[in-house]
Regions:
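Acidic/histidine-rich catalytic cores and adjacent linkers
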Residues: 44-46, 54-60, 76-81, 85-111, ...
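RNase H-like nuclease fold core
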Residues: 3-94, 99-104
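Short secondary-structure boundary/capping segments
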Residues: 8, 51-52, 107-113, 129-134
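Short alpha-helix plus adjacent loop in nuclease-associated cores
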Residues: 121-142
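A short hydrophobic/aromatic micro-motif that marks alpha-helical segments and, especially, helix-coil
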Residues: 12, 53, 135, 290-291
Length: 306
């Protein structure tokens, strides 16, 4: 039935982009003033670069380009096929912190302001806190292993010390994973108790947690670029004083992209449209239980979103 639809009813065999469909698709008429770029795993982990028009709100006319691979040369060689007039119409492009995406945006859309997605910036800070937690957990596991070996050598049974909430040290560190991603006001009662114990035992994790939350507050509270710049400068100072290596790496990444990060405060634009479109592609793929014929899958995708 599907073969019948594919070969006779769909118009797929007469598609003007069939020859290069697996490598790239372009829909120049869909370019708008506000666009976003991201990558998606189409099938079997094969990455494609997707360019979408925000003003289409995930419906028809959303897809501008879908290109196999994320290499700068490959992607730009396709996007430069778009007319210069159209490319210079783009006023803003949102993207993540990947250097290849930044290069693609700069080469293909030179007149557009680049905006680094706020969620990718905040994610760096959250991951820095998690790195501190994981390091502490490994240390706790090593300590427990040493204590077990010592007890065994003495012919005794080892009993791990338990905190007031019933967690052992390694359980405390393992079970704190989710609360460190959340605002303090969103903790449940049990998470609040666990956080209190965690922060008492590991003051560095407490400092790291509040550093990550303060970065989020800059995005939430600041409405103007100059105020955001001042607040970010203060945040850098706090990171320097903390001496945390994990946050030092975060601060350096932010400094590298700070011009694109600060552009967020003009229109508060995020890459949510790209993430949403990627989710639609994955849902469409799941509906057909995977991708057997990649070119035909892209044809159907184009019919819906291009």
């Amino acid at each position: 039935m599907e073969r019948q639809y594919r070969n006779h009813l769909s118009g797929y065999l007469h598609w003007d982009q069939l020859v290069h469909a697996e490598d790239w698709l372009l829909f120049e008429k869909n370019i708008g003033a506000y666009i976003c770029i991201d990558e998606v795993a189409l099938s079997r982990g094969e990455l494609y670069t997707v360019l979408t028009n925000k003003e289409a709100h995930g419906g028809k006319g959303s897809m501008i380009a879908i290109i196999k691979g994320t290499d700068v040369h490959t992607v730009t060689s396709v996007l430069l096929k778009l007319s210069r007039r159209r490319r210079y119409q783009v006023r803003e492009i949102t993207l993540d912190m990947a250097p290849n995406m930044e290069q693609i945006a700069r080469i293909c859309f030179p007149a557009a302001k680049r905006v680094t997605d706020r969620f990718h910036v905040q994610k760096l800070a959250y991951e820095a806190v998690q790195e501190m937690r994981v390091k502490a957990r490994w240390e706790a596991l090593d300590e427990e292993s040493t204590q077990i070996a010592y007890a065994k050598a003495c012919g005794k049974m080892y009993h791990a010390p338990v905190f007031a909430n019933g967690d052992t040290r390694k359980q405390l560190l393992a079970r704190s994973i989710y609360l460190l991603y959340k605002k303090e006001s969103l903790w449940t009662q049990s998470q609040g108790i666990r956080a209190e114990i965690l922060f008492k035992e590991y003051p560095d994790i407490k400092k790291g947690y509040y550093l990550s939350m303060r970065l989020g507050l800059i995005y939430h509270q600041c409405k103007f670029k100059d105020i955001a710049l001042t607040r970010l400068a203060r945040w850098y100072d706090e990171v320097d004083k903390s001496g945390f290596l994990t946050f030092g790496r975060v601060a350096r990444s932010i400094q590298t992209h700070y011009l694109d990060i600060i552009n967020f405060f003009e229109r508060r634009a995020t890459n949510a449209a790209a993430e949403s479109f990627n989710a639609k592609i994955k849902a469409f793929r799941a509906q057909f239980r995977g991708v057997r014929d990649r070119a035909f899958f892209l044809y159907r995708l184009a019919k819906l979103y291009a």
